[in-house]
Amino acid sequence: MDSAWTALDMETQTMLKTAIKDPKTVDLEKLSNAVVEHSLKDLSFCKDAGRMCYAVVQAEAQKTASSVFRRNLLNRLQQEFIAREETRKRSMQEWVCVVTFICSIFDYIKVNNSPIAALVDPVYDCLFGLAQPDSLMNEEEVDCLVVQLHRVGEQLEQTNSERMNQLFYLLRDGFLLQEDLSSMTRLLLLEILEFRASGWTLSETAHKYYYSEVAD
């Protein structure tokens, strides 16, 4: 998280540190907006942003028994989710950041040790977007899809296995029926199909095979 932390401007870093120590002294709505804005510009940051947001959510819940930061964060995520198709048309990088950030929040922030129910369908909808035939033609989107399924696939399947089945029917059909996929996309799709079929894990042999191929 240190590298993610230092990617922020000094004002936001200070707000974050203060929010974790004494959340009632910080404008938590302003802080959540700043974190979201930075996440939409910086892919490496938004991968770890969920952990940072979790620290603030925990501090606020324990020290003030409120949820201003979480509520505003979810409102912003909803806005970004609603605008996702326009975002994808405008900027592929920002679209990938939106998906990565939503999945990071889904991964880290829990309510009573369970994922936030309101995020389940938006996460699925984003992943379905990445599994469409035109998205499978874009290695950046395929890579994002596979990374997020490694990260939250098992948790997602536990919340709604039927939608996961539907998603993997799409991926399997893309792998088998789309003739113009790149060799890297085929490799990534084959890996994620095998990963889920093996119970969301890869044998050491399979891991070496796929990741030596990716490295090459």
Swiss-Prot record:
Where in or outside the cell is it found?
A: Cytoplasm; Nucleus
Per the UniProt entry, what is one GO biological process? regulation of translational initiation
Task: Name the cystine pairs.
Answer: none
Q: What is its main location?
A: cytoplasm
Q: Which Gene3D superfamilies match?
A: 1.25.40.180
List, alphabetically, the GO terms of the cellular component aspect: cytosol; nucleus
Q: Does the keyword Nucleus apply?
A: yes
MIF4G domain location, by residue?
Answer: 2-199
According to its UniProt entry, the function of this protein is described as: Functions in replication-dependent translation of histone mRNAs which differ from other eukaryotic mRNAs in that they do not end with a poly-A tail but a stem-loop. May participate in circularizing those mRNAs specifically enhancing their translation.
The record's family statement is: Belongs to the MIF4GD family.
Q: How does it assemble?
A: Interacts with eif4g1, eif4g2 and slbp; probably tethered by SLBP to the 3'-end of mRNAs ending with the histone stem-loop, it also interacts with eif4g1 which is bound to their 5'-end.
Q: What is this protein called?
A: MIF4G domain-containing protein A
Q: Which organism is it from?
A: Danio rerio (Zebrafish)
This protein's gene is called mif4gda
